[in-house]
Protein backbone atom coordinates (compact mmCIF):
# COMPACT_ATOMS: atom_id res chain seq x y z
CA UNK A 1 0.00 0.00 0.00
CA UNK A 2 2.88 2.32 0.91
CA UNK A 3 4.55 1.64 -2.46
CA UNK A 4 1.31 2.47 -4.32
CA UNK A 5 0.99 5.79 -2.46
CA UNK A 6 4.60 6.61 -3.23
CA UNK A 7 4.08 5.85 -6.94
CA UNK A 8 0.89 7.97 -6.97
CA UNK A 9 2.75 10.83 -5.30
CA UNK A 10 5.52 10.66 -7.89
CA UNK A 11 3.00 10.69 -10.74
CA UNK A 12 1.19 13.66 -9.19
CA UNK A 13 4.48 15.50 -8.74
CA UNK A 14 5.42 14.83 -12.37
CA UNK A 15 2.03 16.14 -13.57
CA UNK A 16 2.38 19.29 -11.46
CA UNK A 17 5.92 19.79 -12.76
CA UNK A 18 4.69 19.36 -16.33
CA UNK A 19 2.14 22.10 -15.78
CA UNK A 20 4.49 24.39 -13.84
CA UNK A 21 5.85 27.65 -15.16
CA UNK A 22 9.30 27.31 -16.66
CA UNK A 23 11.98 29.98 -16.51
CA UNK A 24 14.76 30.05 -19.09
CA UNK A 25 17.35 32.84 -18.91
CA UNK A 26 15.00 35.22 -17.14
CA UNK A 27 11.94 34.67 -19.38
CA UNK A 28 8.96 32.61 -18.22
CA UNK A 29 7.07 30.16 -20.42
CA UNK A 30 4.07 27.88 -20.45
CA UNK A 31 4.98 24.66 -22.23
CA UNK A 32 2.67 22.66 -24.44
CA UNK A 33 4.12 19.16 -24.30
CA UNK A 34 1.68 17.78 -26.88
CA UNK A 35 3.18 19.80 -29.74
CA UNK A 36 6.44 21.06 -28.23
CA UNK A 37 5.52 24.74 -28.32
CA UNK A 38 6.08 27.44 -25.73
CA UNK A 39 4.17 30.59 -24.83
CA UNK A 40 5.87 33.56 -23.19
CA UNK A 41 4.01 34.35 -19.99
CA UNK A 42 4.12 36.67 -17.01
CA UNK A 43 5.76 35.54 -13.81
CA UNK A 44 2.95 34.59 -11.46
CA UNK A 45 4.71 35.92 -8.36
CA UNK A 46 4.66 39.50 -9.63
CA UNK A 47 8.22 40.06 -10.85
CA UNK A 48 8.20 42.46 -13.82
CA UNK A 49 10.35 42.22 -16.92
CA UNK A 50 12.64 45.20 -17.48
CA UNK A 51 15.40 46.48 -19.73
CA UNK A 52 16.04 45.04 -23.19
CA UNK A 53 14.42 41.65 -23.78
CA UNK A 54 15.28 39.24 -26.60
CA UNK A 55 12.82 36.37 -26.97
CA UNK A 56 14.45 33.28 -28.51
CA UNK A 57 12.84 31.34 -31.35
CA UNK A 58 13.10 28.15 -29.30
CA UNK A 59 14.09 26.93 -25.85
CA UNK A 60 15.69 23.67 -24.70
CA UNK A 61 13.98 22.15 -21.65
CA UNK A 62 14.88 18.74 -20.21
CA UNK A 63 16.23 17.53 -23.54
CA UNK A 64 13.24 18.76 -25.58
CA UNK A 65 13.31 21.65 -28.06
CA UNK A 66 10.23 23.91 -27.75
CA UNK A 67 9.33 26.41 -30.44
CA UNK A 68 8.23 29.80 -29.04
CA UNK A 69 4.99 30.49 -30.95
CA UNK A 70 3.06 33.01 -28.88
CA UNK A 71 3.24 35.86 -26.41
CA UNK A 72 0.55 35.12 -23.90
CA UNK A 73 -2.14 37.01 -22.04
CA UNK A 74 -0.65 39.91 -20.03
CA UNK A 75 2.86 38.54 -20.57
CA UNK A 76 4.54 41.96 -20.33
CA UNK A 77 1.58 43.89 -18.92
CA UNK A 78 2.56 46.89 -16.76
CA UNK A 79 6.27 46.26 -17.25
CA UNK A 80 7.17 49.91 -16.81
CA UNK A 81 10.90 49.14 -16.95
CA UNK A 82 10.73 47.41 -20.34
CA UNK A 83 12.63 49.53 -22.89
CA UNK A 84 12.90 47.25 -25.94
CA UNK A 85 11.90 43.78 -27.04
CA UNK A 86 12.85 41.54 -29.92
CA UNK A 87 10.21 39.07 -31.10
CA UNK A 88 11.35 36.05 -33.14
CA UNK A 89 9.87 34.94 -36.45
CA UNK A 90 8.47 31.83 -34.77
CA UNK A 91 5.76 33.83 -32.96
CA UNK A 92 2.34 33.74 -34.66
CA UNK A 93 0.15 35.48 -32.09
CA UNK A 94 0.41 38.35 -29.63
CA UNK A 95 -2.13 37.83 -26.87
CA UNK A 96 -4.58 40.15 -25.15
CA UNK A 97 -2.90 42.84 -23.00
CA UNK A 98 0.50 41.39 -23.91
CA UNK A 99 2.31 44.77 -23.71
CA UNK A 100 -0.39 46.80 -22.00
CA UNK A 101 0.96 49.97 -20.34
CA UNK A 102 4.63 49.38 -21.15
CA UNK A 103 5.07 53.12 -21.14
CA UNK A 104 8.86 53.15 -21.68
CA UNK A 105 8.70 51.01 -24.81
CA UNK A 106 9.54 53.32 -27.75
CA UNK A 107 9.48 50.95 -30.73
CA UNK A 108 8.70 47.37 -31.58
CA UNK A 109 9.03 45.26 -34.69
CA UNK A 110 6.34 42.68 -35.25
CA UNK A 111 7.64 39.76 -37.33
CA UNK A 112 5.94 38.59 -40.52
CA UNK A 113 4.97 35.33 -38.82
CA UNK A 114 2.37 37.10 -36.63
CA UNK A 115 -1.23 36.78 -37.85
CA UNK A 116 -3.12 38.00 -34.80
CA UNK A 117 -2.77 41.04 -32.53
CA UNK A 118 -4.97 40.63 -29.46
CA UNK A 119 -7.17 43.00 -27.50
CA UNK A 120 -5.33 45.93 -25.89
CA UNK A 121 -2.06 44.28 -26.90
CA UNK A 122 -0.16 47.60 -26.99
CA UNK A 123 -2.74 49.81 -25.29
CA UNK A 124 -1.36 52.82 -23.35
CA UNK A 125 2.20 52.27 -24.53
CA UNK A 126 2.50 56.04 -24.38
CA UNK A 127 6.15 56.27 -25.53
CA UNK A 128 5.66 54.10 -28.62
CA UNK A 129 6.44 56.36 -31.61
CA UNK A 130 6.28 53.90 -34.48
CA UNK A 131 5.18 50.40 -35.21
CA UNK A 132 5.14 48.35 -38.37
CA UNK A 133 2.31 45.89 -38.80
CA UNK A 134 3.30 43.08 -41.18
CA UNK A 135 1.05 41.97 -44.02
CA UNK A 136 0.56 38.61 -42.31
CA UNK A 137 -1.85 40.26 -39.84
CA UNK A 138 -5.51 39.94 -40.85
CA UNK A 139 -7.23 41.70 -37.96
CA UNK A 140 -6.41 44.36 -35.38
CA UNK A 141 -8.09 43.59 -32.08
CA UNK A 142 -10.14 45.68 -29.70
CA UNK A 143 -8.15 48.68 -28.38
CA UNK A 144 -4.94 47.12 -29.71
CA UNK A 145 -3.13 50.48 -29.87
CA UNK A 146 -5.51 52.62 -27.82
CA UNK A 147 -3.81 55.37 -25.85
CA UNK A 148 -0.51 55.18 -27.75
CA UNK A 149 -0.32 58.96 -27.57
CA UNK A 150 3.20 59.28 -29.05
CA UNK A 151 2.39 57.25 -32.15
CA UNK A 152 2.63 59.68 -35.09
CA UNK A 153 2.01 57.39 -38.04
CA UNK A 154 1.05 53.83 -38.75
CA UNK A 155 0.71 51.84 -41.93
CA UNK A 156 -2.03 49.27 -42.03
CA UNK A 157 -1.19 46.44 -44.44
CA UNK A 158 -3.59 45.28 -47.13
CA UNK A 159 -3.98 41.93 -45.38
CA UNK A 160 -6.18 43.56 -42.72
CA UNK A 161 -9.92 43.31 -43.41
CA UNK A 162 -11.29 44.89 -40.24
CA UNK A 163 -10.12 47.61 -37.88
CA UNK A 164 -11.36 46.61 -34.45
CA UNK A 165 -13.34 48.61 -31.94
CA UNK A 166 -11.24 51.36 -30.30
CA UNK A 167 -8.16 50.07 -32.13
CA UNK A 168 -6.45 53.49 -32.30
CA UNK A 169 -8.62 55.42 -29.86
CA UNK A 170 -6.84 58.24 -27.96
CA UNK A 171 -3.80 58.18 -30.25
CA UNK A 172 -3.50 61.95 -30.05
CA UNK A 173 -0.14 62.05 -31.87
CA UNK A 174 -1.47 60.49 -35.08
CA UNK A 175 -1.62 63.10 -37.85
CA UNK A 176 -2.62 60.98 -40.83
CA UNK A 177 -3.47 57.41 -41.63
CA UNK A 178 -4.09 55.46 -44.81
CA UNK A 179 -6.54 52.60 -44.70
CA UNK A 180 -5.93 49.90 -47.34
CA UNK A 181 -8.63 48.76 -49.75
CA UNK A 182 -8.77 45.37 -48.05
CA UNK A 183 -10.64 46.90 -45.09
CA UNK A 184 -14.44 46.59 -45.19
CA UNK A 185 -15.38 47.84 -41.71
CA UNK A 186 -14.09 50.56 -39.43
CA UNK A 187 -15.09 49.53 -35.92
CA UNK A 188 -16.81 51.50 -33.20
CA UNK A 189 -14.55 54.26 -31.81
CA UNK A 190 -11.69 52.99 -34.00
CA UNK A 191 -10.08 56.44 -34.21
CA UNK A 192 -12.07 58.17 -31.48
CA UNK A 193 -10.37 61.17 -29.87
CA UNK A 194 -7.37 61.18 -32.22
CA UNK A 195 -7.15 64.95 -31.82
CA UNK A 196 -4.01 65.32 -33.98
CA UNK A 197 -5.53 63.56 -36.98
CA UNK A 198 -5.94 66.08 -39.82
CA UNK A 199 -6.77 63.79 -42.71
CA UNK A 200 -7.72 60.21 -43.38
CA UNK A 201 -8.16 58.29 -46.59
CA UNK A 202 -11.01 55.79 -46.58
CA UNK A 203 -10.96 53.29 -49.47
CA UNK A 204 -14.01 52.32 -51.49
CA UNK A 205 -13.92 48.83 -49.96
CA UNK A 206 -15.37 50.15 -46.68
CA UNK A 207 -19.11 49.59 -46.30
CA UNK A 208 -19.63 50.51 -42.65
CA UNK A 209 -18.29 53.32 -40.46
CA UNK A 210 -18.90 52.37 -36.84
CA UNK A 211 -20.32 54.27 -33.89
CA UNK A 212 -18.00 57.11 -32.80
CA UNK A 213 -15.43 55.88 -35.33
CA UNK A 214 -14.00 59.39 -35.71
CA UNK A 215 -15.71 61.04 -32.75
CA UNK A 216 -13.82 63.96 -31.17
CA UNK A 217 -11.18 64.08 -33.91
CA UNK A 218 -11.03 67.83 -33.44
CA UNK A 219 -8.10 68.33 -35.84
CA UNK A 220 -9.83 66.61 -38.76
CA UNK A 221 -10.42 69.25 -41.44
CA UNK A 222 -11.61 67.05 -44.29
CA UNK A 223 -12.74 63.53 -44.95
CA UNK A 224 -13.97 61.81 -48.08
CA UNK A 225 -16.58 59.12 -47.59
CA UNK A 226 -16.45 56.66 -50.51
CA UNK A 227 -19.50 55.57 -52.48
CA UNK A 228 -19.21 52.06 -51.01
CA UNK A 229 -20.32 53.10 -47.50
CA UNK A 230 -23.93 52.21 -46.74
CA UNK A 231 -24.09 52.99 -43.02
CA UNK A 232 -22.65 55.73 -40.81
CA UNK A 233 -22.91 54.90 -37.13
CA UNK A 234 -24.04 56.70 -34.01
CA UNK A 235 -21.81 59.76 -33.23
CA UNK A 236 -19.48 58.68 -36.06
CA UNK A 237 -18.15 62.22 -36.59
CA UNK A 238 -19.45 63.91 -33.45
CA UNK A 239 -17.35 66.79 -32.06
CA UNK A 240 -15.14 67.00 -35.15
CA UNK A 241 -14.89 70.75 -34.69
CA UNK A 242 -12.41 71.24 -37.56
CA UNK A 243 -14.77 69.92 -40.25
CA UNK A 244 -16.31 72.72 -42.32
CA UNK A 245 -18.11 70.65 -44.93
CA UNK A 246 -18.82 67.03 -45.69
CA UNK A 247 -20.19 65.13 -48.67
CA UNK A 248 -22.37 62.09 -48.11
CA UNK A 249 -22.41 59.72 -51.08
CA UNK A 250 -25.38 58.16 -52.81
CA UNK A 251 -24.59 54.74 -51.29
CA UNK A 252 -25.37 55.81 -47.70
CA UNK A 253 -28.82 54.58 -46.67
CA UNK A 254 -28.65 55.12 -42.90
CA UNK A 255 -27.01 57.59 -40.53
CA UNK A 256 -27.09 57.06 -36.77
CA UNK A 257 -28.07 59.35 -33.90
CA UNK A 258 -25.83 62.39 -33.31
CA UNK A 259 -23.58 61.38 -36.22
CA UNK A 260 -22.44 64.98 -36.83
CA UNK A 261 -23.42 66.53 -33.51
CA UNK A 262 -21.24 69.29 -32.05
CA UNK A 263 -19.34 69.77 -35.33
CA UNK A 264 -19.07 73.44 -34.48
CA UNK A 265 -17.22 74.42 -37.67
CA UNK A 266 -19.59 72.66 -40.07
CA UNK A 267 -21.23 75.11 -42.49
CA UNK A 268 -22.59 72.85 -45.24
CA UNK A 269 -23.55 69.27 -46.08
CA UNK A 270 -23.67 67.90 -49.62
CA UNK A 271 -26.02 64.98 -50.21
CA UNK A 272 -25.58 62.91 -53.38
CA UNK A 273 -28.64 60.77 -52.75
CA UNK A 274 -31.91 61.90 -54.40
CA UNK A 275 -33.96 60.61 -51.46
CA UNK A 276 -32.90 61.20 -47.86
CA UNK A 277 -31.26 58.33 -46.00
CA UNK A 278 -32.81 57.01 -42.81
CA UNK A 279 -31.42 59.12 -39.99
CA UNK A 280 -31.38 59.00 -36.20
CA UNK A 281 -32.13 61.66 -33.64
CA UNK A 282 -30.30 65.00 -33.37
CA UNK A 283 -28.14 64.39 -36.42
CA UNK A 284 -26.79 67.96 -36.41
CA UNK A 285 -27.17 68.73 -32.71
CA UNK A 286 -25.29 71.91 -31.74
CA UNK A 287 -23.94 72.50 -35.27
CA UNK A 288 -24.44 76.23 -34.83
CA UNK A 289 -22.77 77.27 -38.11
CA UNK A 290 -24.58 74.80 -40.35
CA UNK A 291 -26.73 76.74 -42.80
CA UNK A 292 -26.96 74.89 -46.10
CA UNK A 293 -27.81 71.39 -47.31
CA UNK A 294 -26.92 70.78 -50.96
CA UNK A 295 -29.03 68.14 -52.71
CA UNK A 296 -29.25 66.80 -56.28
CA UNK A 297 -31.33 68.69 -58.85
CA UNK A 298 -35.01 67.92 -58.33
CA UNK A 299 -34.48 66.51 -54.82
CA UNK A 300 -35.42 69.54 -52.72
CA UNK A 301 -39.00 68.36 -52.22
CA UNK A 302 -37.83 64.97 -50.95
CA UNK A 303 -35.57 66.72 -48.43
CA UNK A 304 -38.36 68.99 -47.21
CA UNK A 305 -38.56 66.92 -44.02
CA UNK A 306 -36.75 67.06 -40.68
CA UNK A 307 -33.92 67.45 -40.05
CA UNK A 308 -33.03 68.64 -43.55
CA UNK A 309 -35.70 71.32 -43.83
CA UNK A 310 -34.30 73.09 -40.79
CA UNK A 311 -31.59 74.42 -43.10
CA UNK A 312 -31.36 76.19 -46.44
CA UNK A 313 -31.82 73.50 -49.11
CA UNK A 314 -30.02 74.23 -52.39
CA UNK A 315 -30.28 72.04 -55.48
CA UNK A 316 -27.33 71.25 -57.70
CA UNK A 317 -23.58 71.09 -57.30
CA UNK A 318 -22.06 74.04 -55.53
CA UNK A 319 -18.51 75.20 -56.02
CA UNK A 320 -16.64 76.74 -53.14
CA UNK A 321 -15.50 80.34 -53.26
CA UNK A 322 -11.94 79.14 -53.69
CA UNK A 323 -12.81 77.94 -57.22
CA UNK A 324 -13.71 81.42 -58.40
CA UNK A 325 -10.71 82.38 -60.50
CA UNK A 326 -9.42 85.90 -60.87
CA UNK A 327 -10.30 85.82 -64.56
CA UNK A 328 -14.02 85.74 -63.63
CA UNK A 329 -13.81 89.06 -61.82
CA UNK A 330 -15.21 91.69 -61.96
CA UNK A 331 -18.68 90.20 -62.24
CA UNK A 332 -22.25 90.85 -61.18
CA UNK A 333 -23.33 88.93 -58.08
CA UNK A 334 -26.91 87.67 -57.66
CA UNK A 335 -28.76 86.04 -54.80
CA UNK A 336 -30.78 82.85 -55.26
CA UNK A 337 -33.89 84.89 -56.09
CA UNK A 338 -32.14 86.42 -59.09
CA UNK A 339 -31.67 89.85 -57.53
CA UNK A 340 -28.36 91.61 -58.20
CA UNK A 341 -26.72 92.30 -54.87
CA UNK A 342 -23.36 93.57 -56.09
CA UNK A 343 -22.51 95.00 -59.53
CA UNK A 344 -19.13 94.36 -61.14
CA UNK A 345 -17.74 93.03 -57.89
CA UNK A 346 -14.09 92.04 -57.46
CA UNK A 347 -15.01 89.46 -54.81
CA UNK A 348 -17.74 88.55 -52.32
CA UNK A 349 -16.33 90.64 -49.51
CA UNK A 350 -18.91 92.67 -47.66
CA UNK A 351 -21.76 90.28 -48.41
CA UNK A 352 -23.39 88.20 -45.67
CA UNK A 353 -22.81 84.45 -45.57
CA UNK A 354 -24.92 82.54 -48.03
CA UNK A 355 -25.16 81.21 -51.59
CA UNK A 356 -24.61 83.52 -54.56
CA UNK A 357 -24.67 83.23 -58.34
CA UNK A 358 -21.65 84.52 -60.27
CA UNK A 359 -21.46 84.05 -64.04
CA UNK A 360 -24.19 81.41 -63.82
CA UNK A 361 -22.44 79.37 -61.10
CA UNK A 362 -23.36 78.99 -57.45
CA UNK A 363 -20.81 79.89 -54.83
CA UNK A 364 -20.78 79.77 -51.04
CA UNK A 365 -19.51 82.56 -48.84
Task: Name what the model sees in each region.
Residues 33-36, 49-70, 80-93, 103-116, ...:
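Structural signature of tandem-repeat unit edges
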Residues 315-337:
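Residue-level detector of functionally pivotal "anchor" positions at catalytic/ligand-binding pockets or at interdomain
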Residues 15-17:
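N-terminal signal peptide c-region/cleavage motif recognized by signal peptidases
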Residues 73-75, 95-100, 118-123, 141-146, ...:
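Consensus positions within tandem repeat domains that build extended binding/scaffold surfaces
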Residues 20, 303, 320-321, 338, ...:
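Terminal processing/anchoring signals of secreted or surface-associated proteins
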Residues 3-9:
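Sec-dependent signal peptide recognition
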Residues 1-3, 353-365:
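C-terminal tail/sorting-segment detector
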Residues 21-27:
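Cleaved targeting-peptide boundary
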Amino acid sequence: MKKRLTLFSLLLLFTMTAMAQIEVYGIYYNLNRSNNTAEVTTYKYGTRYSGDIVIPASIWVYGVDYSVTSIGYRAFCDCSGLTSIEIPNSVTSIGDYAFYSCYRLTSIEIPTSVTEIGESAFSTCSSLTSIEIPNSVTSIGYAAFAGCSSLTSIEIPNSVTAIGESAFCWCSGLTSIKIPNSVTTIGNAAFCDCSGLTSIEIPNSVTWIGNAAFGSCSGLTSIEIPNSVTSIGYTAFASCSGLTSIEIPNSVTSIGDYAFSRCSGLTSITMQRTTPPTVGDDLFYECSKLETIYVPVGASEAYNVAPWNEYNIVEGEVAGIESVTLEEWPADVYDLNGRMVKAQAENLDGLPKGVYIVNGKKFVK
